[in-house]
Design a protein with these regions (language model features):
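Thiol-/selenol-based redox modules, centered on thioredoxin-like
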Residues: 136-189
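Hydrophobic beta-strand anchors of alpha/beta hydrolase catalytic cores
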Residues: 49-51, 58, 83, 120
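Boundary at the C-terminal end of the N-terminal hydrophobic targeting segment
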Residues: 22-26
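Thioredoxin-like thiol-disulfide oxidoreductase module
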Residues: 70-74, 78-159
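Bacterial N-terminal signal peptides
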Residues: 8-19
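A short beta-strand-turn-helix
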Residues: 31-49, 77
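Conserved redox-active cysteine motifs that mediate thiol-disulfide chemistry
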Residues: 53-68
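Positively charged n-region of N-terminal signal peptides that target proteins for export
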Residues: 1-8
Length: 189
């Protein structure tokens, strides 16, 4: 009887511990670790860095991830960029997702503290900003001067393509057309 009770208590303790670990927020690499790895890879591979600030609940972030993961668009982007992702803006009650530790500091230092998601910054291999996703007023993004997030409208796509020309000057016209076409087919007018 004592061994059955002991086994039952051990089983309950294991189930309880498993439940606690399943409900705890995940531990993500720190922003410093993500950026150190991205800079190391970018320098070794002679690429720039595409830094993406996103959140699990963000629909446009998922659309941008689909763009980066697409079999046609992804390889073009990967040819020129090492992608670094930092999760920010997660909801405290969400036990399945967490912010990347320390991600708010680089977001703020890159002038994206008030930007929507995704907030995109293209950096050189040393981590120096080249361009970000704040659309210039001259392109008539709505609203002007704001973060484009996922490039879906013609002005947003135009700005994203200008970002690429600045941060990936070796992007060929054929590659640029393929990316622009991909975004235009999945965007909104």
């Amino acid at each position: 009887m004592a061994s059955v009770m002991k086994s039952t208590l051990l089983l309950l303790a294991a189930v309880f511990a498993l439940g606690l670990s399943a409900s705890a927020q995940p531990t993500l690499p720190s922003a410093d670790a993500v950026m150190t790895q991205a800079k190391t890879r970018a320098a070794a591979e002679h690429k720039n860095i595409l830094l993406v600030f996103s959140a699990s609940w963000c629909g446009p972030c998922k659309m941008f991830e689909a763009f980066l993961d697409d079999p046609k668009a992804g390889p073009i982007m990967n040819k020129f960029f090492v992608t670094a992702r930092l999760d920010v803006g997660e909801r405290p009650a969400d036990k399945l997702h967490a912010d990347s530790p320390g991600a708010e500091a680089p977001r703020a230092s890159l002038n994206g503290a008030e930007a929507g998601y995704p907030f995109l910054v293209m950096l050189d291999p040393a981590g120096k900003p080249i361009v970000n996703s704040f659309c210039p007023a001259s392109l008539k993004c709505d609203p002007a001067g704001e973060n484009i997030g996922y490039p879906a409208t013609p002005p947003e796509i135009a700005w994203f393509m200008q970002m690429l020309r600045q941060a990936a000057p070796a992007l060929s016209p054929k590659e640029a057309d393929a990316l622009q076409s991909w975004l235009s087919q999945r965007g909104r007018s």
